[in-house]
Design a protein with these regions (language model features):
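Conserved alpha/beta-domain cores
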Residues: 1-306
Length: 306
């Protein structure tokens, strides 16, 4: 809601405190395992789009902005199609301080935990990238901020490490993955949004006609539950091939509900992905599917599986 740099800096300073505390908890819990952290991604309407009069009045007291001014600012931020609007890396490019604040919180938290003997491996993930230049710009902010944090803490580069990667959730990023990979140390296919953008299908609004489409055999299943392997799956394979053309050992995975769907998981294994990420309750299913995929692959190599 801030309408100038000073107001924005003040708000970011407050947010950083909460984020740093959360990251410390995450790093401690992981006990030395890698932590992939996606930079802020949700569209603004998820925070302020449905504020009623009482909420505006309460917010007015907290931030010292009048209710009419809050209403005016909300109207100025309104978007007709927020899921494809000012979010993800677009927000970070418009307001680099938003990205810088998150990086400060991540790395300062990493240092706090490392001081107590726990290894920390932050993987900073830039969301909603469509152009390689977007990732390049955000990586510049991340690296510059990291240098400032190290200087402030009196650390060498080797004493506070991190990697930078990107979500592949826009078809253009998958198609131009060879260029995007020049600035990435890992890819993570965000298959929820890649399905939306690849099929032109809203995850929130398609439930009214998906059953009809399945009855009419337009779709064999719900593409948000099981990956559309012939369409969206081709974008995944294209992205894997392009990324590894540039960097042969590029780490690639997926995140989203498809990571817990057995058929989708087997497809990802065949496509050469290194890992899948899914909701905690789906992990046993994902592990079983990966084991089955590996056994099927070995069987095919020996000619035992048709």
């Amino acid at each position: 809601l801030a309408d100038d740099d000073a107001g924005r800096a003040k708000a970011l300073k407050k947010i950083k405190v909460f984020m740093k505390k959360d990251f410390i908890g995450i790093f401690k819990s992981l006990e030395g395992r890698p932590a992939t952290i996606r930079l802020l991604d949700p569209p603004l309407h998820e925070f302020i789009g449905t504020m009623d009069a009482a909420q505006k009045k309460d917010l007015s007291k907290k931030i010292g902005m009048s209710a009419p001014a809050i209403t005016k600012r909300i109207h100025a931020l309104h978007e007709e199609n927020p899921m494809l609007g000012h979010r993800g890396c677009r927000l970070g490019i418009s307001y680099p301080a938003v990205t810088a604040m998150q990086v400060e919180a991540i790395l300062e938290a990493a240092h706090e935990v490392q001081k107590k003997g726990t290894k920390v491996l932050p993987e900073i993930m830039v969301p909603l990238v469509a152009y390689a230049r977007e990732l390049e710009l955000q990586k510049d902010v991340i690296d510059t901020t990291a240098g400032e944090v190290r200087k402030k803490l009196g650390l060498k580069k080797s004493e506070l490490k991190y990697t930078v990667g990107t979500m592949i959730e826009i078809p253009r990023a998958a198609i131009t993955a060879a260029e995007v990979a020049k600035h990435a140390e890992f890819f993570s296919f965000g298959t929820n949004d890649l399905t939306q953008t690849g099929l032109g299908l809203s995850r929130d609004d398609s439930s009214s006609f998906l059953p009809t489409y399945q009855d009419a055999e337009v779709l064999n299943n719900n593409p948000f539950a099981g990956l559309d392997q012939e369409g969206v799956g081709q974008l995944v394979e294209m992205g894997v091939k392009g990324g590894r053309t540039t960097k042969k050992k590029l780490k690639i995975g997926i995140c989203g509900e498809h990571g817990g769907d057995p058929d989708s998981v087997k497809f990802f294994h065949r496509s050469g992905l290194n890992y899948v990420s899914c909701s905690p309750f789906r992990i046993p299913v994902a592990r079983l599917a990966l084991a089955q995929a590996a056994l099927e692959e070995k069987g095919m190599a020996r000619g035992e599986v048709s």
